[in-house]
Structure formats: structure tokens, C-alpha cells
């Protein structure tokens, strides 16, 4: 019917348009990297070099909550997800009140708050924190077009800088980068 044809046409146009825009952006970025006047190329980590197969970042917490509920027979798995979201928000609020110039919170600070606001034993909270790290390591994948740009920058002798404002510990971020094939860079700023 006509309505289905319009919907299909609209979806096809969206993906064609999105693909075309991404391709054009990639070509523009390649030209910039090849520019001899450009000496340094900087890449953000999450959602640029690396992606996670979740619609929203908090979707990882849904999986974390399900695994926690199963491991400890907690029942209400949504409570763990909400506690994790609340702990991050509270940690950020506290940090901002105490030190407005500080960049960002750490995973340890998030889980210190999580421990305060939950009724869970601290050993369970530690397990949840470790599981979150394992899930991040498991579900971070290489973004292929960004890897091509990264490799081009390395190949052309540019100084390559990687940066992120992520709360994960530096050693975990380095492991994610290594797992995704990003081991040769000049500087890492967190």
C-alpha cells in the first residue's frame, strides 16, 4: 500500500542520507589529515574511536543490573540500575559543589556513593563495580571509519593524541584502546 511504500522510501532515504553524510565527513577528515600543515590529530575515545552497541549509555546499566540480580538473587533488578544512575549524578553534584574546576568524577567516587545510598553489602557493591568494568571491556568495539582515520594519521607521521572525559580508570581505558587496535598513539589525556 501507499503508506508502506512511503515509510520504506523514507527509511531508505534516511539510511542513504546518513551513509552519504558520514562518507562525505570521512573524506573531509582524510583531506585534513593529509594536509601537510596539520601536525597533530586528536581523537575522542567513546563514540568516536570506540562504540558500544547500546542505544543510550545507561543501557549498559540494565545489563549490569540483570547480571547483579541473577548473581545475588536480588529480585528488583531495576533498583540496581537506578542506584547506579543516581550514584553517578550525586557524585557529580558533590564534586561540582566542592570543586567547580575539577574535570570529572571517577568510577571509585561513583561507587563510593553507590555504597552509601544502597542497602547492599560493600562486597556486592565491589562486585558490581568490577562487573561494570568487565562489561565495558566486553562491549567496546572498534569504530571502523575512525580506525581508518587513526591509521592514516599514524601512517602520515602526525602526532596522534587520544582524549576522553570518561570516569573509567586509566588502565581500563588503555585496555579498551588496545582491545580495539589503538595502541600506537603519542599522548593520552583523561
Question: Residues of each region from the PLM?
Answer:
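Asp-based, Mg2+/Mn2+-dependent phosphohydrolase catalytic module
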Residues: 3-8, 12, 16-37, 173-190
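Substrate-recognition/cap helix-loop segment adjacent to the acidic, metal-dependent catalytic center
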Residues: 118-119, 154-161, 166-190
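Asp-based phosphoryl-transfer active-site loop
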Residues: 34-54
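Conserved phosphoryl-transfer catalytic core
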Residues: 56-98
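Flexible loop/turn segments at secondary-structure boundaries
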Residues: 49-51, 142, 168-171
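Short, surface-exposed acidic
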Residues: 69-87, 115-132, 181-190
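Short, acidic loop-to-helix structural element flanking the phosphoryl-transfer center
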Residues: 100-105, 112, 116-162
Amino acid at each position: 500500500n501507499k503508506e508502506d511504500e512511503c515509510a520504506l522510501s523514507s527509511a531508505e532515504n534516511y539510511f542513504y542520507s546518513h551513509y552519504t553524510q558520514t562518507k562525505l565527513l570521512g573524506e573531509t577528515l582524510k583531506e585534513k589529515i593529509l594536509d601537510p600543515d596539520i601536525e597533530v590529530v586528536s581523537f575522542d575515545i567513546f563514540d568516536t574511536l570506540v562504540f558500544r552497541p547500546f542505544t543510550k549509555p545507561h543501557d549498559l546499566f540494565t545489563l549490569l543490573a540483570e547480571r547483579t540480580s541473577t548473581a545475588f538473587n536480588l529480585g528488583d533488578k531495576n533498583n540496581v540500575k537506578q542506584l547506579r544512575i543516581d550514584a553517578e549524578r550525586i557524585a557529580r553534584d558533590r564534586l561540582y559543589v566542592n570543586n567547580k574546576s575539577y574535570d570529572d568524577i571517577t568510577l571509585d567516587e561513583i561507587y563510593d556513593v553507590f555504597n552509601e545510598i544502597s542497602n547492599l553489602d560493600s562486597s556486592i557493591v565491589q562486585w558490581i563495580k568490577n562487573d561494570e568494568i568487565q562489561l565495558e571491556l566486553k562491549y567496546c568495539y572498534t569504530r571502523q571509519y575512525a580506525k581508518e582515520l587513526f591509521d592514516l594519521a599514524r601512517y602520515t607521521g602526525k602526532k596522534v593524541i587520544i582524549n576522553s572525559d570518561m570516569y573509567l580508570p586509566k588502565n581500563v581505558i588503555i585496555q579498551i584502546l588496545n582491545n580495539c587496535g589503538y595502541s600506537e598513539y603519542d599522548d593520552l589525556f583523561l
